[in-house]
Regions:
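Class I SAM-dependent methyltransferase Rossmann-like catalytic core
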Residues: 41-110
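Conserved SAM/SAH-binding beta-strand->alpha-helix loop
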Residues: 146-148
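A conserved beta-strand element that flanks and buttresses the S-adenosyl-L-methionine
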Residues: 190
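Conserved SAM-binding loop of SAM-dependent methyltransferases across substrates and taxa
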Residues: 124-137
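Conserved beta-strand signature within the Rossmann-like core of class I S-adenosyl-L-methionine
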Residues: 216-225
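Conserved SAM-binding loop
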Residues: 153-154
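Short alpha-helix
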Residues: 247-264
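A short, conserved alpha-helix within the catalytic core of class I
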Residues: 197-210
Length: 286
């Protein structure tokens, strides 16, 4: 099965949004890789989960985090091993650790011994639950627009015995009215995996201002995808949880820091995975 690693052509974000000419060599190559990926889903557990739930979904990320090749037959497990060995999947696993470290530092640096951590695009919220388990005084508010992700987060909280410390609500991170309704205001805001799926720079820039003018958290923990040699393969072959192409926006971390500075935040730490695909940052209010 083709691995579809680095693309010889570094496609821009605008190019990734457009379909390729139907008979161009690149279109034919990615079409063949997409067909191979769908066929591989009959054998590889990771590809099956990705095609069934989306390659940006909680179930797929859980499979990546587990990092245990699974499949029907030895060939299926080998296909799965290659999937899990992608640079992007390596980066996913590394940023989970980096995000946990940044959130743990944020909880420890909070001005209160019982910090409230708000994840505004929580999904199943694996990072937050790991921090709550290690920091008995911390509490969490988990918000998302996806009811299925919130149901998964509730179930996870119950399994871990953390339901009394976790509040789950359906809301958009970019809804200023929803931010104004958050009470009490969180001490730490986590925005992990949020910026890459929203393509409008002005939306994110305004979001930092909205955060500062509404809940004004002491700290913000974020991640941003800055470069990825597999970005075109992901956009042409993978599908997201809505069945649409996985077109992710790459941004320099400097852009995030500039918008944060304008809203009154400065970096306390910036970490990178070993491939330099992601940056994980912790911001503090100035």
């Amino acid at each position: 099965m083709p691995t579809g690693t680095e693309s010889a052509h570094a496609a821009s974000f605008d190019e990734l949004q457009r379909d390729l000419p139907a008979l161009s060599p690149r279109a034919l190559r990615f079409r063949a890789q997409a067909a191979a990926s769908r066929a591989g889903a009959l054998l590889s557990e990771g590809l099956r989960v990705g095609h069934e739930h989306g390659f940006d979904s909680g179930p797929f990320m859980d499979h990546v985090y587990a990092n245990e090749p699974q499949g029907r037959t030895a060939l299926g497990r080998e296909i799965d091993r290659r999937l899990l060995g992608r640079r992007t999947c390596h980066a996913f696993r590394e940023i989970r650790v980096l995000a946990r470290e940044a959130l743990t530092e944020a909880a420890a640096a909070s001005s209160t011994p019982e910090p409230l951590i708000a994840d505004l695009a929580a999904g199943p919220a694996p990072y937050v639950f790991e921090v709550l388990s290690a920091h008995p005084g911390a509490r969490a508010l988990l918000a998302d627009i996806d009811p299925a992700a919130l149901a998964q987060a509730r179930a996870h909280a119950e399994r871990l015995g953390l339901s009394d410390r976790v509040t789950v609500t359906r809301a958009s991170a970019f809804d200023r009215d929803a931010l104004e309704r958050i009470d009490p205001a969180p001490d730490v805001v986590a925005e992990l995996g949020l910026y890459g799926i929203y393509h409008d720079d002005a939306l994110i820039e305004r979001h930092f201002v909205d955060l500062a003018e509404t809940i004004a958290p002491e700290q913000i923990v974020f991640n941003v995808q800055t470069q990825n040699p597999e970005i075109e393969h992901i956009a042409r072959v993978w599908r997201d949880h809505r069945g649409e192409r996985c077109v992710w926006r790459l941004r320099p971390v400097e852009s995030i820091l500039e918008w944060a500075a304008a809203a009154g935040y400065e970096p306390a730490s910036i970490r990178a995975d070993s491939y330099g695909i992601y940056r994980v940052g912790r911001l503090v209010r100035t």
